Amino acid sequence: MNSVKFSLTFVLLMACLQGVNSAEFLPSFVVTTAQELSALITGQTAQGTFADGTAVQSKYGADGTLTASAPSFSDAGRWRVEDGRICGSLRKLGEFCNDARLDSGSLYLRRKNGEIVRYEVK
């Protein structure tokens, strides 16, 4: 009986912890305007970690340039913002638009594969 309770508790805990990597934003996440997004990321670096453990970094230049990097990978291009989205084009990866939300000072972006990634902007 105790092992069943432990197993159920563990499964529920893991489901809660994995919620950020699901395809839906949490209800507390705030949709941002283009102006808010621009103010947050212009001239800044956003660092995050994909669900598979890959550390990623994006540098949003004040001139609209974008540099994206991960271990053994780098790409460059341009970025722009729309209400609730960061969009752009990278030389290797091509065009993209990621839904963007804010929560507790962190930036959350939904990748093309649906994964939601938490970024710290510095």
Question: What residues fall within each predicted segment?
Answer:
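Lipid interaction determinants
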Residues: 2, 8, 17-122
